[in-house]
């Protein structure tokens, strides 16, 4: 079975378009919502992102970053083909057909290991930023919303969060027991 759309309990729909050929065959590359708006989902491969980073470094006169052209086929989370969503464009709006944005609605940057690094809005403003553990792929150690302080995370030896630290306010600690997790705030 192939997912071709969704309908919520209010009858609102999303219809998915999948790529028929090429390196993104079978991947969702377009969405139409119930209002008839059409969105293009821009996907990239790890090899494309690595080459783009190398070209940017060359253009800036810097040494190219050491970014692999592929990611490990399998991670603790399952298979990873290296394909990531890089941008979402509004391509058709029946209410405003002549007033489509000249930039993507949202854009995503990824780390060399395929982790989400940043989210940008349509003005190009960074709205979110993520930092990951160098030793453990996919383990987020910090994130920040635009205009807010960075939230940091600490983990125990089994990979469970033990502390969420906000330097400007409310922080949390997590204690794990057999059938219970106790969360304590800094107040």
Task: Go through each PLM region and give its residues.
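Extended charged/polar low-complexity repeat regions
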Residues: 1-187
């Amino acid at each position: 079975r192939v997912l071709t759309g969704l309908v919520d309990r209010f009858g609102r729909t999303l219809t998915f378009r999948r790529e028929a050929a090429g390196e993104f065959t079978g991947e969702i590359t377009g969405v139409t919502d119930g209002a008839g708006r059409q969105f293009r989902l821009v996907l990239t491969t790890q090899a494309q992102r690595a080459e783009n980073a190398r070209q940017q470094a060359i253009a800036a006169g810097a040494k190219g970053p050491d970014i692999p052209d592929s990611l490990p086929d399998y991670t603790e989370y399952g298979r990873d083909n290296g394909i990531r969503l890089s941008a979402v464009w509004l391509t058709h709006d029946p209410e405003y057909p002549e007033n489509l944005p000249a930039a993507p609605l949202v854009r995503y940057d990824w780390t060399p290991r395929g982790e989400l690094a940043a989210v940008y809005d349509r003005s190009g403003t960074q709205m979110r930023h993520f930092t990951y553990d160098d030793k453990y792929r996919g383990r987020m150690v910090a994130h920040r919303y635009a205009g807010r302080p960075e939230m940091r995370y600490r983990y125990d030896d089994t990979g469970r969060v033990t502390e969420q630290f906000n330097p400007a306010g409310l922080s949390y600690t997590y204690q794990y027991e057999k059938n219970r997790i106790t969360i304590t705030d800094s107040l």
